[in-house]
A protein has these predicted regions:
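Helix-to-loop junction immediately C-terminal to a conserved catalytic motif
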Residues: 377
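Conserved ABC ATPase "signature" region
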Residues: 438-456, 501-504
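Catalytic Walker B motif of ABC-type/P-loop ATPase nucleotide-binding domains
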Residues: 482-486
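Transmembrane alpha-helices and adjacent helix-loop boundaries
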Residues: 1-314
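A short, surface-exposed alpha-helical micro-motif characterized by mixed small hydrophobic
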Residues: 523-525
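The feature captures the beta-strand-to-loop junction immediately N-terminal to the Walker
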Residues: 362-364
Length: 563
């Protein structure tokens, strides 16, 4: 049992003792309401915490569940075992319906769109009187009834709600396996890297949105059965603000964060009510202090296991590279062009990289080198031309599919989430990998000289080690083609040599390596061929010596035709 699991169990036991021994009927009512909010917050953590999207629709999903229960229960006499799953399905169905247009939006546009959806549902609830009861809502919602047992109030209802909280927590634990948490973290913190690892960010966000809606619908259904009345307030913005505040104060991640936030914010108004007209001020001050001193939630202040510190020993490349290379037929880039507005980034570029080759790409800043890497990896789509991986046309394929088919890459600036450890980062590359016989994480770490850093958070690593981690992550998926975008930038001579040894071993094992860099001293002894780009055009593609002797290359790259 982990320390946090023990804390959750202790919190549950303390709640049970409090309710049984000290709790009045009103206290039991508050604890019941807290349980409803825990479920609501657990759902909101999927989209707001793990997916990193500020959704303002969680209150709307809560309202959909509440109104569905109210209509079915009060109007048609349906019992809990019917209303509960239908409410969940309707909330999730509504989320699925709006997800396609809404999830394409980013940042504040997504927040505004979800807020608009919430307000639309509120208008429908207020004005569709024959169905929703209008401003008066729907009274007479039946209590929870299970197999002839009616749970109206008190300890039986409290116990039932918290049993459902336990079930919701179990579902969260089942959905958030370590590999999926890593995928969410990469998508949220380094969105550029996610598709390059085969992670379908759109599908992951869709899953988070649906789960948040389903939990919201479940919480709304429970609220309707325990409150016995549904009013437009259940669709009001106040529910959304309450949910958001609970999540921020308690913590965006984890069951314990949801427990802390829901329990604290449900009871705070009661604890401060003796202050009469000043209690809202006191609550506001407490929340402000919490956000300032615990920006990641109160749960982040609790002790947690610390990973081992970074070793002071210099890493050394070791091991055989054969296990990191998938059989392939090479990469062909045929006449691709790409423009951004009036800027021609690539102009009829053709390039071939065969297994066992290291093809270097040089060129001045703005020549189109990174655009070429982006077009090959699917991060951008070429306007014309053809790109083939073996016999497969990948010209317009999504980046996450291209990664799964065998093209791995690194970035000019290492794209590594600070909170994940080195081993978690490397393991994340294998979440969606389809290649058989993947190397073990330990094997990849050993080959890249990173084994001593396996438990170190990436945010604490030096720049040179971060470069190495990116390469290790790329190799863990066992690609056919490896694209390295300026891997030597900012490295010492010794670190550059180690990267070079690694590239040579990979090429000797049959990998096709595309090496983009400005450092001629690094590229010349490594590359099988060296191509030079100028203003999006390949002006030379030959052996390194012949390319560097080309007058056009000298003029474009060095600023002089003769040296």
């Amino acid at each position: 049992m982990t320390r946090r699991t023990g804390l959750i169990a202790a919190a549950g036991l303390a709640l049970a003792i409090y309710a049984l021994i000290f709790g009045s009927s009103y206290d039991q009512r508050l604890l019941t309401l807290s349980g409803v909010y825990v479920i609501l917050v657990l759902g909101y953590q999927f989209i707001f915490g793990h997916a990193g999207a500020l959704s303002l629709a969680q209150g709307a999903f809560f309202g959909v569940g509440a109104y569905a229960t109210g209509i079915l229960g009060a109007r048609y006499g349906a019992e809990f075992l019917i209303t509960f799953p239908i409410s969940i399905a309707l909330a999730a169905g509504f989320a699925a319906l709006v997800a396609i247009p809404v999830l394409r939006l980013k940042s504040h546009y997504f927040a505004l769109a979800t807020l608009a959806l919430s307000q639309l549902l509120l208008l429908i609830a207020v004005n569709w009187e024959p169905v929703t009861g209008g401003a008066n809502g729907i009274p007479g919602v039946p209590p929870v009834t299970l197999f002839g047992w009616t749970l109206t109030r008190g300890l039986p209802l409290l116990a039932f709600v918290w049993v459902l909280v336990g079930l919701a927590a179990a579902i969260v634990h089942w959905q958030l396996k370590p590999s999926r948490i890593a995928a969410f973290t990469i998508m949220r913190d380094t969105p550029l890297a996610a598709p390059a690892l085969g992670i379908d960010s759109g599908l992951l966000r869709f899953r988070a949105f649906l789960l948040s809606a389903a939990f919201g619908g479940a919480a709304g259904a429970l609220f309707a059965h325990t409150n016995r009345v549904v009013s437009p307030e259940t669709l009001g913005f106040g529910v959304m603000i309450t949910c958001l505040t609970m999540t921020v104060v308690g913590g965006r991640f984890g069951i314990l964060g949801a427990l802390i936030g829901a329990l604290l914010l449900t009871h705070l108004p009661e604890w401060f009510r003796s202050l009469e007209e000043y209690y809202l001020v006191a609550v506001g001050i407490l929340l402000l202090v919490s956000v300032i001193f615990a920006p990641n939630g109160i749960v982040a202040l609790l002790p947690r296991r610390q990973p081992a510190g970074e070793s002071s020993n210099q890493p050394n490349v070791d091991g055989d590279a054969v296990g990191f290379v998938a059989a392939g037929e090479g990469l062909a880039v045929l006449g691709i062009s790409k423009s951004y507005g009036g800027v021609q980034a690539l102009d009829d570029v053709s390039l071939h990289i065969m297994p066992g080759e290291i093809v270097g790409i040089i060129g001045p800043n703005g020549a189109g080198k990174t655009t070429l890497a982006n077009a090959i990896s699917g991060a951008t789509i070429a306007d014309q031309g053809l790109i083939r991986l073996g016999t497969r046309d990948i010209t317009i394929a999504p980046a996450h599919d291209i990664a799964r088919w065998g093209i791995a890459r690194t970035f000019q600036t290492p794209q590594l989430p600070d909170d994940l450890s080195v081993s978690e980062i490397v393991e994340a590359a294998q979440i969606t990998a389809t290649n058989p016989n993947l190397p073990s994480v330990d094997t990849a770490l050993t080959f890249c000289g990173l084994h001593e850093y396996s438990t170190t958070p990436c945010g604490t690593l030096a720049h040179g080690i971060r470069r190495r981690v990116e390469i290790c992550r790329a190799l863990a998926a066992r690609p056919q083609v490896l694209i390295l975008d300026e891997p030597a930038a900012g490295l010492s001579a010794e670190e550059q040599e180690e990267i070079g040894v690694m590239c040579r071993k990979l090429a000797d094992a049959g990998m096709a390596v595309l090496l983009i860099d400005h450092n001629i001293g690094f590229l010349q002894p490594l590359a099988t061929r060296l191509a030079c780009l100028e203003a999006g055009v390949v002006i030379a593609d030959d052996t390194p010596d012949l390319t560097l002797a080309n007058p056009r290359v000298r003029d474009a790259y060095f600023g002089m035709a003769e040296l």
